[in-house]
Amino acid sequence: MTLAYAPTAQTITIRNDWTKAEVEALFAMPFNDLLFNAQVVHRQHFNPNEVQVSTLLSIKTGACPEDCKYCPQSARYDTGLEKERLLEIEKVIQRAKEAKQVGSTRFCMGAAWRNPRDRDMPYILKMVEEVKSLGLETCMTLGMLTRDQAVALKQAGLDYYNHNLDTSPEYYGDIITTRTYEDRLNTLENVRAAGMNVCSGGIVGMGETVSDRASMLVQLANLPEQPQSVPINMLVKVKGTPLDSVEDLDYFEFIRTIAVARIMMPKSHVRLSAGREAMNEQMQAMCFMAGANSIFYGCKLLTTSNPDTHEDVMLFKKLGINTERTRDYSDEAHQQVLEEEIAQQQEQAEGSNDLFIDATKPKVAAKQQHATEA
């Protein structure tokens, strides 16, 4: 008998009214209790044995005018990074094809800009169209966006736009001075208004306090609509940046941040993002237990190191994790299909001695997907 997780049709109400005191209380929970609660939430909305996989490519590297203290791409710091012009569309398409071949379902493109210039937009839009034509989900991070730029990206086929809040409003001024917190929130509003999915998270380990981490998650969870994707980054210290000698964050604190994010944002994909190169397999496994269900494939994230794809494949094999496939139907339809599947399996289980419902092979969902494809 194969034992698998037993999902439930019960859902958790999405809250946009979290207080910092509530979130600090979550951070203060005993570690095992916190992870247990995060797992309960996670299993009500996701298959815990599936992870969404993206690939991230730097399409324009270095010479950024911003002063983000963690970033090796800032022109203000001597990090030895060679600046590069906007990548040719043909090279971007080739990298997207390679990403699809190794199992990525989303291709993310990042440019070290304060904001895209009008002269660059035609090339950017063409990149989106070409990558989208490969059957991949598309994501970009280009800095701040105007409403018109967001609409143009949406019309070109962009699915996700990444713009992180980075840290709490209280600590933000210690990390960045060249753009305001409000600037970031305005860009997220422009992305939402254009009808794109929001990808927004932050970085931990920059010298912030637990209260700062709680405050950052409050900002994300209390947005008018919670981000569809929430990357949680561990600071990668780069020589030459102002944060290259900051004290290391305790790994358990990072895992706690993943777990609290999962509890607060039940339907969001929580991405185990930058910093994985320094994590052993056991720590990454605990992050997945805490509710992380998205990673980047590939040996580099923009300019910093990332585990080799082969290493990730082997880790997934050890943990029994499969890569999540792109859904061809809406979230609402999928929820209905899932509930029907659960009810069907519960009826079947009443006449058997199985202790677990096997929901790893959703027959009803598969039928609907085949019908959609037909």
UniProtKB/Swiss-Prot annotation:
Binds 1 [4Fe-4S] cluster. The cluster is coordinated with 3 cysteines and an exchangeable S-adenosyl-L-methionine. SUPFAM superfamilies: Radical SAM enzymes (SSF102114). Residues 344-374 are annotated as: Disordered. GO terms for biological process: biotin biosynthetic process. Pathway: Cofactor biosynthesis; biotin biosynthesis; biotin from 7,8-diaminononanoate: step 2/2. SMART domains: BATS, Elp3. Keywords: 2Fe-2S, 4Fe-4S, Biotin biosynthesis, Iron, Iron-sulfur, Metal-binding, S-adenosyl-L-methionine, Transferase. Catalyzes the conversion of dethiobiotin (DTB) to biotin by the insertion of a sulfur atom into dethiobiotin via a radical-based mechanism. This is Biotin synthase. It comes from Alteromonas mediterranea (strain DSM 17117 / CIP 110805 / LMG 28347 / Deep ecotype).
